[in-house]
Regions:
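Basic phosphate/pyrophosphate-binding loop/patch that engages nucleotide-derived ligands
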Residues: 108-116, 131-144, 232-236
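C-terminal glycine/acidic-rich active-site capping loop/insertion
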Residues: 122, 234-305, 330, 334, ...
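Glycine- and charged-residue-rich phosphate/anionic-cofactor binding loop of Rossmann-like
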Residues: 27-29, 297-314
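Rossmann-like dinucleotide-binding domain that binds NAD(P)(H)
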Residues: 152-223, 229, 243, 309
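N-terminal Rossmann-like dinucleotide-binding module
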Residues: 1-46
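Beta-strand-loop-alpha-helix segment that lines the small-molecule cofactor/substrate pocket
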Residues: 61, 66-124
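Conserved SAM-binding strand-loop segment of SAM-dependent methyltransferases
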Residues: 48-55
Length: 342
């Protein structure tokens, strides 16, 4: 039985408490948050959990083996280093840190043999996303040409990070998982209408393989979207996280030129529809799968699928996007990123 403590009881932390509490091989023994009301809500639902206002006191007193850090990204380095120093296994929510310097420091942080440091990139544990990856690598869609991601909603607007820092880590993680390579350059633009940090953003990642990935994120759209499209030479994959019954579609369409006698041009490109396949996918709550994986890593000593290096790569791309946006969208080479948060 692995004893779990959760630091951070805001919007996402209680979901970790619920998932670990429902697993047979885990026990949630403590939670921490400086917000007494947030801690109280968790305590009301899970009376057996010991509440703490200060995570430092939790580290001193709570009899836990592992800690989940679900706090603002700016606090991740301090809290994660303290947890590791106390000998705990750590699962830290995305992003690993709010700057590449802190992320690099965590990647280099000394850990005892078998001590686990995992980053919570939840879509790596989504069955439909993993099916997309399988279909790419078995040649079903041919050569990948480009990827388009959209992650939008009407709020919640945050003051501590830009919309890139809030939403884009999901799509960056998905793209890296699907392509298994780092981008060569990143370019981005941010628009500010509500929060000074930027509440609408477009990011473009260019890869050495020739693939271009575009990520659109917004806090201002009226419709909640969680979509990923992968366009190949033979077919396209369409992932819609809001479609619970059919999250993935394989669209087998071809684009060809044929004669046209209209006044609009000599040739007209037309898309010829073919089969649309809905693959059968056994969907489970990705957060539950992620929690199970964390426990398996603790029990076996295996390296997490979303390890600290994986989290560092996402942070490097985020930093490149933020820098590009400050330079009116000029491309930023990944090799040119600083190694400190100064």
């Amino acid at each position: 039985m692995t004893r779990i403590a959760v630091i951070g009881c805001g919007r996402w932390g209680p979901n970790y408490v619920r998932n670990f509490a429902e697993l047979d091989n885990a026990e949630v023994v403590a939670v921490s948050d400086p917000n007494a009301e947030a801690v109280g809500r968790v305590k009301h639902r899970f009376p057996e959990v010991e509440p703490y206002a200060d995570y430092r006191k939790l580290l001193q007193e709570a009899p836990c083996d592992a800690i989940v850090v679900v706090t603002p990204a700016s606090t991740h380095r301090e809290i994660t280093e303290a947890c590791l120093g106390a000998g705990k296994h750590v699962l830290v929510e995305k992003p690993l840190a709010d700057n590449p310097g802190d992320a690099l420091a965590l990647a280099r942080c000394a850990r005892a043999p078998g001590q686990i440091l995992m980053v919570g990139h939840i879509f790596r544990f989504n069955a439909a996303i993993n099916k997309m990856r399988d279909l790419i690598y078995d040649g079903t869609i041919g050569q990948v040409r480009y990827i388009h991601c959209a992650r939008t909603n009407l709020g919640p607007v945050r003051a501590d990070v830009s919309v890139f820092g809030d939403l884009a880590p999901h799509d960056i993680s998905i793209v890296l998982h699907l392509l298994n390579e780092m981008p060569v350059t990143v370019s981005a633009t941010l628009a500010t209408y509500v929060e000074s940090g930027g509440d609408l953003g477009i990011m473009r990642m260019r890869f050495e393989s020739g693939v271009v990935a575009v990520v659109y994120v917004s806090w201002l759209d009226p419709r909640k979207r969680r979509e990923v499209e992968v366009i190949g030479s033979n077919a396209a994959l369409e992932f819609d996280d809001m479609n619970l019954s059919e999250p993935l579609r394989i669209s087998q369409k071809a684009l060809r030129a044929e004669p046209s006698y209209s006044t609009f041009g000599e040739f007209q490109f037309v898309a010829h529809a073919s089969n649309v396949i809905i693959p059968a996918i056994e969907m489970r709550e990705p957060l539950r799968v992620q929690c199970e994986h964390f426990l398996q890593c603790i029990q076996t000593g295996r390296q997490p699928l979303t390890d600290v290096e994986d989290g560092l790569r996402t942070c490097l791309i985020l930093a490149a996007a933020e820098r590009s946006a400050q330079m009116d969208g000029s491309p930023v080479a990944l090799a040119g990123l600083p190694e400190s948060g100064q």
